[in-house]
Swiss-Prot record:
Its main location: cytoplasm. This is UPF0291 protein lp_2062. Transmembrane segments: none annotated. It comes from the Bacteria. It is found in: Cytoplasm. GO terms for cellular component: cytoplasm. It comes from Lactiplantibacillus plantarum (strain ATCC BAA-793 / NCIMB 8826 / WCFS1). Keywords: Cytoplasm. Pfam families: DUF896 (PF05979). Belongs to the UPF0291 family. InterPro entries: DUF896.
Amino acid sequence: MISKELLARINELAHKAKAEGLTELEEAERQELRQKYLKEFRAGFRQQVEMLQVYDKDGKEVTPEKVRQVQRDRGLRDD
């Protein structure tokens, strides 16, 4: 989960960059924080997709096979 502190610091650096610019140290920190944010975002998104089940109008499950396989590997499916 993405922490409020992480987002607050990213936003703080973004505002400072627009207002007066960043030092090299702050620029490096901003890049590191962005990478951490993206890593956490992708992990959360992947988890949501892996828990997803898709059904058509007739009630038949049409979840993509790749997602089904990941769910089987993690013990989330019985089929």
